Amino acid sequence: MTEEVWMGTWRPHRPRGPIMALYSSPGPKYLIPPTTGFMKHTPTKLRAPAYSFRGAPMLLAENCSPGPRYNVNPKILRTGKDLGPAYSILGRYQTKTMLTPGPGDYFPEKSTKYVFDSAPSHSISARTKAFRVDSTPGPAAYMLPMVMGPNTVGKASQPSFSIKGRSKLGGFSDDLHKTPGPAAYRQTDVRVTKFKAPQYTMAARVEPPGDKTLKPGPGAHSPEKVTLTKPCAPVVTFGIKHSDYMTPLLVDVE
């Protein structure tokens, strides 16, 4: 009997718990959404209309007026209180009899000029600081207008002449040899005034518009593999063995 050679540290052993991949359906640990109610309803089923039940509403009292605890004045109307003019009588204000002027507050000797005829009297005070007798402008404070030149005021002015430097043009020192020569003028094109021959412009070659994308060549096609228009033998496809731990595809959710 030959001994089996094991690779690594794994050895065949009994599973410690259930392997969830062996089950094709969800176990009890999954919370399946309910098919009744409104909250968390399963999206794979149609939800029927739901109705709520509640108690009967409270009936309103027949008499909604304020009770006898309110004392409403019958003289109060929507425009205010219906009353005639009323006056209030208060007590006399307290008079402070002790705050009276004494004998020293009066000057009866000064009342003669107001009661009897009196001579005019003058008062002598100190000199004011805001007014000075000698505050007149001096000779240098005036700016007399000019009496010479063209800008005189109130007088006729004589003609005035200005003296400036010598001009370089038109003078006796002007060099008449410094005149423009024939080359200083731009020559007029002959074709402006005479017959002009036709002119032609030669441009680059114009290429016709076309498709410059990459297209497949003869070796890119495989006509021997065409089975749509030609008869062919039956073809069998071999798949692979699916694992037992793979979850099956649920197509019909109903």
UniProtKB/Swiss-Prot annotation:
Pfam families with a match to the protein in the record: SHIPPO-rpt (PF07004)
Gene: CIMAP1A
Tissue: Testis-specific.
Keywords per UniProt: Cell projection, Cilium, Cytoplasm, Cytoskeleton, Developmental protein, Differentiation, Flagellum, Repeat, Spermatogenesis
Region (Disordered): 207-226
Family from the record: Belongs to the CIMAP family.
Subunit structure: Microtubule inner protein component of sperm flagellar doublet microtubules.
UniProt subcellular location: Cytoplasm; Cytoplasm, Cytoskeleton, Flagellum axoneme
STPGR repeats: 180-205, 216-241
Protein name: Ciliary microtubule associated protein 1A
Further remarks about this protein from its record: 'Shippo' is a Japanese word for tail.
Biological function: Outer dense fibers are filamentous structures located on the outside of the axoneme in the midpiece and principal piece of the mammalian sperm tail. May help to maintain the passive elastic structures and elastic recoil of the sperm tail.
Any one GO BP annotation for this protein: spermatogenesis
GO CC entries: cytoplasm; cytoskeleton; outer dense fiber
Disulphide bridges, residue numbers: none
Organism: Homo sapiens (Human)
